[in-house]
Amino acid sequence: MEEKKNVIIIGAGLVGSLWAVYLSKAGYSVTIYERRPDIRKAEISAGKSINLALSVRGWTALDAVGVGDEIRKIAIPMSGRVMHDLTGNLTYQPYGKEGQAIFSVSRGKVNATMMDIAEKHGNAIIHYNHDCRKVDLKNGIVWLTNNLTGEEIEAKADLIFGADGAFSAVRYNSMQKLDRFQYSQNFIADGYREILLPANADGSYQMDKNALHIWPRGRFMLIALANEDGSFTCTLFMPHEGGENAFDKLTSKEAVDNFFKTIFPDFYTMMPNIADAWEDHPLSALAIVRCYPWAHGKTALMGDAAHATVPFYGQGMNAGFEDCTVLNNLMHKHNHDWEAIFAEYSKERKPDGDALQDLSLENYYVMRDFVADPAFLLRKKIEAKFSEMYPDKWLPLYSQVTFSNIRYSVAYNQGKVQSEIMDQVMETPEIEQKWDSQEVMDKILSLC
């Protein structure tokens, strides 16, 4: 870079804060505008889910700019899922090989840490309480309003990044006004509500903290991730309305109490006052946002602004962080030629965003309907056995997505091939008895 370029990032969330560190380290002058107050000072939620799952793609992006160790201090490893059935029986399924884990992290703590790093180490300037009203995409001009004072501001930059979430103002107020801009927003039939399961009186955990807990119940499910303070953030995913079990049926304390007592009995014993805590968090919707192109002129979208997805693969934050990795690699590949960078970023990254959205929806059905199914568990055991014997021939789809940096689009396509192979394998006579036999392993090998 011949001269120091000025960059504006709209959104001081997880992706915006991390990208500010990348740009600052690359010699750019960075200013961030955030519509919310400073979450480090205000008594507000960091928005959306309290807990997130951090995996290899996220760590890759964090470690590349030397901030991974700061986040590891506040991360809890989860080596597998624990399924809770109606009678309280537990079934454990490891996520990957021995020693592999995903990490439960607090959205608020990660966000606050990233803001600190962006300001202190990245020399970024963050302006809070500023709403983005409009962006001149080609000329790099942003119009904002201070939502406390009403003051209107015009800011100019060499580059603008919209990292302002699924309901991005950059996208809505500017990108979506472009001719032939492709855009769709689809809400799924299910919503979610969070519940905080407190620690025991002595501060200890009520369940194994090193696992993601799932109560699969067919059309709906409850999950729980551990927090640092001994509590668990639990999330109930269920249809908004229709059917016997839906959020529109849980309109009284009596209904909530009876629902948990009947459907999640072991959870109810840990939190008999669930009905009193029910209203602590609002009922929220789940949306998938697809759009294209992700960049135009001097402006690009990142994270949820470009590819918001449902949370059922635990990859939303990881995908947003991977956007930083991809843009950083392109920045060096094209020697800071942003016209070339944006063109390749938009074209090459879009298929991965689409694939992740498809993977996330499909994994919802897996988590909801199949994780407690003996045939599904056997299928996963066979895959794990074959992968252990022939690691160069088979990496399970979950491991491709969670424990590697393989492109989402490549993983998705490989997963389809693997699924077809396993469908044939599961038709083997007496598969339950000889699942780990050489005969079964040879059959998979012949189909690969």
Regions found by a protein language model. Name each.
Residues 1-7, 25-26:
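Extreme N-terminal leader/targeting segments of oxidoreductases
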Residues 2-5, 55-196, 446-447:
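Conserved N-terminal helical subregion
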Residues 9-20, 25, 161-162, 195, ...:
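Conserved mid-domain beta->alpha element of the FAD-binding
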Residues 15, 38, 167:
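Conserved Rossmann-like nucleotide-cofactor binding loop
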Residues 24-47:
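Glycine-rich FAD pyrophosphate-binding loop
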Residues 73-77, 125, 264-279, 335-344, ...:
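Acidic/histidine metal-binding catalytic segments
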Residues 116, 130-134, 139-282, 286, ...:
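Conserved FAD-binding catalytic core of PHBH/FMO-like flavoproteins
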Residues 329-448:
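C-terminal helical "tail/cap" subdomain of flavin- and related membrane-associated enzymes
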